Amino acid sequence: MEKLSNSRTPSRRQFLSATGGVLAAATASRISSAKAAEFPSTSIQTNAGQNSSSSSTAPWRKIPIGVFDPAFPDLSLDQMLDKVAGYGLEAMEIGTGGYPDNHHCPLNDLLADPAKLKVWKKKFDDRKIVIGALSCHGNPVHPDAKIAGRDAQTFRNTVLLAEKLGVQVIVGFSGCPGGSPTDTTPNWVTYHWPPEYGQALDWQWKEKVVPYWKDAAKFAREHNVHKLAFEMHPNFVVYNPRTLLRLREAVGEEIGANCDLSHLFWQGCNPVEVIHMLGKQGALYHAHMKDTVMFQNNVDRYGVLNFASTTEELPEASETFRAVGYGHGANTWKDIVRAYMEVGYDGFLSIENEDPILPGDIGVERAAYVLKNVRAELLGSKA
């Protein structure tokens, strides 16, 4: 396995890819690496602990299942779409820049040339794949003006592309400013004491975060884009449901959630409660499908704020990302999908693969297998 170089900063996906071998070794005492990579069980248990084949009679919508395209960085657009169609997936979330990059979406070219945009869109249409969301995860409130300006422009261009495509959902991060006007790096503040931290947090929201997103939401609204779905992610000011709702209250109903439960599992959130709460408030705009496995021995020793920053640290980490079904079983995912149906979620389930053991195509296939089976169980139909 290639060791991560200290001379450069890898992307999260590069890091996770490089950690696969270490993770497999670290978990060998818990489960064999072969079992870690096999198809997860989709056996649904009743409360009595027996297999259930009963179907619900609720008039629930068949929520489409799709995938976020950074899972396939080495495939051309045509190759990726053929693979996605082969998995029987129905929708895609496409990265337009920022951290996800734009491997399959030459944003500026598509905006500049209507003919190119038409050809690009037809590739999806020909395979009956819906473009359900565009993603431009970045940090438009970064204290470095060049970074902030770049990411803000990517957001604006993504809005313009969404308008042309008729896409209503743009996925991203809230961003994180510095802690003062003179800071040069972001400062993620989660606790108000000692007092200077509380002052920094108040300054971030009042002077940077809320003003930027008010303007950004207005721009989106003017271009017929009404759903900005924020991933609740550590190192950004919106990192849990409470901070998401705080920004929504301050900015408006354009702000909603990209409910990526992989970041909420380790925070101790109940996924069904989160979905119900956000859904009842009309704030559920997108759903990343990604799992997290918790290493309880390390949680017991170190707590949950215990992440690996190098491959050498991974065996001591408290959690890491997995494909759907490899951190939590089919019963949990059935409850999650049921919750989305119960609140009338009108988006799609977007598989995001950041599993360090299962490469992109395999991780996506396994996640799709779980999600299609639990969806079929809930609807009383075949997967």
Which residues make up each language-model segment?
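Catalytic domains of carbohydrate-active enzymes, especially glycoside hydrolases
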Residues: 80-98
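Active-site acidic/histidine proton-transfer and metal-coordination neighborhood
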Residues: 18-28, 51-57, 61, 79, ...
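Conserved, mostly hydrophobic/aromatic
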Residues: 67, 84, 92, 124, ...
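N-terminal twin-arginine translocation
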Residues: 9-14, 25-51
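Short, acidic/polar
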Residues: 74-84, 150-159, 269-277, 333-335
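Acidic/histidine-rich catalytic cores of soluble enzymes
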Residues: 62, 91-92, 134, 194-330, ...
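Glycine-rich, proline-tolerant flexible connector loops at the mouths of alpha/beta enzymes
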Residues: 95-119
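N-terminal secretory signal peptides
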Residues: 1-10
